[in-house]
């Protein structure tokens, strides 16, 4: 096999497969950018958003996006929303500050895991999980512990392909006001790129890494992409290593 493969050809080959995709968490910053990039690249024949409320879009490009409104507290009642998708992207997440400790665990672990279970039962072959740098189920920090726990639990479901993305601090213009995160982003933005890139990453780079990864054939059932790999893959243009 050639050392690299043309990205344009990989994308075209992928489009020819007429695959369908769902996105969990499309109302959040990463999910929103992911949806935009998916539509711009035209990789999937059907795009479905699964969320607790219907989102409104003004742009013509969004007119064919399907939406499934679910109650995450009663996901078993909405199993049909997870049926018939080849690929799934999970960008669900909240913060302890916003939802409290119990609410954070419920969203970032319980909702994610239940959604993955229903997706697997519904025929999803490739599940993509947005996690976090430092995720570790043995961590003493709740945030990293929960992220590590859900990574491991989803792996046990044995998707045909399971991709975990562990970005550092996400650099973006977040829709909701979080002064602490804003200060962190300003801090990383002022640092030399070589240092900042080891601990942070623009949301658009994460999203492009996800999509560049999904189009390249892989033999591994489970793959873990840390922050550096996300940078490398997200910035790839002409070719990709298989």
UniProtKB/Swiss-Prot annotation:
An example Gene Ontology CC term for this record: nuclear envelope
Q: Which residues carry this modification: N-acetylalanine?
A: 2
Principal location listed in the UniProt entry? cytoplasm
Q: Does the keyword Acetylation apply?
A: yes
Q: InterPro entries in the record, alphabetically?
A: NAD(P)-bd_dom (IPR016040), NAD(P)-bd_dom_sf (IPR036291)
Localisation? Cytoplasm
Report any one BP term from Gene Ontology: positive regulation of programmed cell death
Q: Which domain of life is it from?
A: Eukaryota
- What keywords would UniProt list here? Acetylation, Cytoplasm, Disulfide bond, NADP, Translation regulation, Tumor suppressor
State where NADPH binds: 27-30, 52-53, 92-93, 143, 147, 170, 178
**Region Required for interaction with elongation factor EEF1A1: start-end pairs:** 2-25
Q: How does it assemble?
A: Monomer. Forms homodimers during oxidative stress. Interacts (via N-terminus) with elongation factor EEF1A1 (via middle-region); the interaction is direct and competes with EEF1A1 binding to guanyl-nucleotide exchange factor EEF1B2, thereby inhibiting GDP for GTP exchange and reactivation of EEF1A1. Interacts with nuclear transport receptors XPO4, IPO5/RANBP5, IPO7, IPO9 and KPNB1 as well as GCN1L1/GCN1 and LRPPRC probably through their HEAT repeats. Binds NCOA5/CIA.
Provide the function of this protein.
Represses translation by preventing reactivation of elongation factor eEF1A. May also inhibit nuclear import by competing with nuclear import substrates for binding to a subset of nuclear transport receptors. Has additionally been proposed to act as a redox sensor involved in cellular oxidative stress surveillance.
The protein's name in its UniProt record: Protein HTATIP2
């Amino acid at each position: 096999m050639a050392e690299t493969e043309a990205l344009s050809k990989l994308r075209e080959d992928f489009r020819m497969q007429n695959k369908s995709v769902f996105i969990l968490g499309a109302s959040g910053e990463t999910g929103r950018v992911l949806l935009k990039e998916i539509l711009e690249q035209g990789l999937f024949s059907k795009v479905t958003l699964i969320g607790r409320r219907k989102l409104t879009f003004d742009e013509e490009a969004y007119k064919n996006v399907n939406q499934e409104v679910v109650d995450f507290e009663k996901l078993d009642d909405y199993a049909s929303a997870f049926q018939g998708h080849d690929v799934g992207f999970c960008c669900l997440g909240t913060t302890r500050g916003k939802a409290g400790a119990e609410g954070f665990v419920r969203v970032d672990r319980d909702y994610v895991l239940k959604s993955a279970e229903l997706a697997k039962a519904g025929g999803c072959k490739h599940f993509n999980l947005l996690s976090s740098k430092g995720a570790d189920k043995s961590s003493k920090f709740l945030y990293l512990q929960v992220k590590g726990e859900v990574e491991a639990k989803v792996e046990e479901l044995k998707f045909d392909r399971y991709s975990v993305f562990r970005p550092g601090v996400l650099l973006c213009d977040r829709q909701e006001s979080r002064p602490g995160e804003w200060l962190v982003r300003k801090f990383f933005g002022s640092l030399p790129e070589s240092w900042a890139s080891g601990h942070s990453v623009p949301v658009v780079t994460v999203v492009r890494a996800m999509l560049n990864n999904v189009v390249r054939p892989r033999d591994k059932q489970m793959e873990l992409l840390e922050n550096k790999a996300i940078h490398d893959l997200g910035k790839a243009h002409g070719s990709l290593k298989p």
